[in-house]
Curated annotation (Swiss-Prot):
Gene Ontology annotations for the cellular component aspect, listed alphabetically: membrane
Subcellular location: Membrane
Top-level taxonomic group: Bacteria
UniProt organism field: Bacteroides thetaiotaomicron (strain ATCC 29148 / DSM 2079 / JCM 5827 / CCUG 10774 / NCTC 10582 / VPI-5482 / E50)
Regions crossing the membrane: 41-61, 117-137, 149-169, 216-236, 241-261, 266-286
Lineage, broadest ranks: Bacteria, Pseudomonadati, Bacteroidota, Bacteroidia, Bacteroidales
Official protein name in the record: Phosphoinositol dihydroceramide synthase
Gene knockout outcome: Phosphatidylinositol dihydroceramide (PI-DHC) is absent. Levels of inositol phosphoceramide (IPC) are severely reduced and ceramide levels are increased. Results in a mild growth defect. Abnormal RNA level of genes involved in carbohydrate degradation. Does not appear to affect production of outer membrane vesicles (OMVs) or OMV cargo selection.
Length: 305
């Protein structure tokens, strides 16, 4: 059983989480499910308690994303629609029937069923694969590498979320469907990924993007960032060559899909890649060189190892 201090800490934090969530954005069934699952893991026994604590970076990531509903980024800074579109066209524009268009506009008109299928498969990997990779590291007892990966994953997300507030930006599908005037409370849009749903007669992407917390959060593309982090730690962790090759293919596929499906400009993708590399470098060569943070990391590792 956990100590009295641990028990009290977890119960108080969980109660605060549920109360704040209910007050600020409203409780949903997944909040209660997540809280119940965490408490079961924490109190079931020592192995599951270690897992519950190890998963905290991913839990904080999910909570942080959800809580962005409290204060939409467009209430902090103006939304960029035309500026990003025009910059994309000037840097990466392509000619289509004598007209200069963005790559996303080109693919909105020119698309292929095979590409739509692969696009859907790649985009379904962008969160599950990094999380499954982290769990593999954890259960293979490579917990120091796991913890570094999990904390960098969280750190990259926090950098990306900060970017959303610094420069709110509309995705390509918004400019295509709505023009250049920001319309607040615009619902999420499945964009080109809807073709995957249509091919298979499902609503996978419609259910995901219909509940998007904020559509004006295209810069940087965190879709482009996650597999970069996974690939970096697959290399650091000396994973087998076929794992590294698979991660490389998935990473490149997600980058291409982001553009092909009109969810991100090339600029967004490049900034997402930069965000991932910046987060990794700052964590490994900045934070880990600070004694206080290193001590925190070591205590965390000792708890979950």
């Amino acid at each position: 059983m956990p100590s009295k201090k641990e028990t009290l800490t977890v119960i108080v934090i969980m109660a605060l989480f549920l109360l704040l969530t209910a007050a600020c954005i409203g409780l949903r069934s997944e909040h209660l499910l997540m809280a119940a699952l965490y408490l079961v893991l924490f109190f079931a026994g020592l192995p599951t308690r270690k897992l519950a604590v190890a998963l905290l970076p991913f839990a904080i990531f999910g909570i942080s994303y959800d809580w962005m509903r409290i204060c939409p980024n467009y209430e902090v800074n103006p939304i960029d629609v035309a500026g990003l579109y025009n910059l994309e066209k000037s840097l990466f524009g392509v000619m289509d029937n004598g007209v200069l268009v963005t790559p996303c506009e080109y693919f909105a008109v020119h698309h292929w069923a095979v590409a739509d299928v692969f696009a859907g498969i790649f985009y379904l990997c962008w969160v599950p694969v990094p999380i499954l990779f982290g769990l593999c590291l954890y259960f293979k007892k490579e917990r120091k590498t796991y913890l570094r990966f999990a904390l960098v994953f969280l750190f990259v997300n926090l950098i990306g979320f900060a970017g959303y507030y610094i420069h709110p930006a509309a995705p390509p599908w918004y400019a295509i469907n709505y023009g250049f005037e920001p319309i607040l409370n615009t619902p999420g849009n499945v964009a080109g990924l809807g073709r995957f749903d249509e091919i298979f007669g499902v609503t996978i992407f419609d259910s995901i993007y219909g509940r998007n917390a904020n559509v004006f959060a295209a810069v940087p593309s965190l879709h482009a960032a996650y597999m970069v982090v996974a690939l970096v730690y697959a290399i650091i962790g000396k994973c087998r060559w076929y794992v590294i090759a698979l991660f490389s293919v998935i990473m490149a596929g997600i980058w291409g899909t982001a553009i092909y499906s009109c969810h991100h400009y090339i600029i967004d993708v490049l900034l997402g890649i930069s965000c991932a590399l910046l987060g990794w470098l700052f964590f490994e060569y900045g934070l880990m060189k600070i004694r206080g943070f290193r001590n925190f990391f070591d205590r965390y590792y000792q708890y979950i190892k």
